[in-house]
Amino acid sequence: GYGLTPLVVAAQAVPIVAVAPALVLWLGTGAATKAAIATYLTYFPVTIATTRGIQAVPAESRELFHTIGASKRTVLFGLEIPFALPLIFVGLETAAAFSVVGAIVAELPFGSPDGLGVVILTSWQFYIFQPESLYCVALAACSLGAVFVLGIRSIAYFSLGARSQGEVL
């Protein structure tokens, strides 16, 4: 069913600029807060893709597992997750790109002395004088996101083989 989907969607509707300061208050200014902010931006595509993949399992397959008396765990790990893997990897690709945004946004409320977020703030404040820095950060973020996405695609290709090329769904 749809169980947690409305809560996941509602949580994603809260802007990251509203969530980040609250996380700083709760978790401090360390790596855990940065990871939490990146996670906040990445859980949504993975959760939705996984849910859709599991919902797409054919009824006949579920009936077969039910007929042979498979436990809920066997159905989950033997049928649902393997069937959903192509969509899970699509969600992970999207999340990989969002993780770069999350990591950069996570640097903004901390007053961090270095990082891409600091360069963005500095370039924005002095845009007339340093536009090249802003462009370099944009290029670095794009490159990092592309590397992450290609990494996920490589894992998907080696994990799923032909299924990662769209032959399942």
Annotate the PLM regions.
Residues 1-8:
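Transmembrane-helix boundary motif in ABC transporter permease subunits
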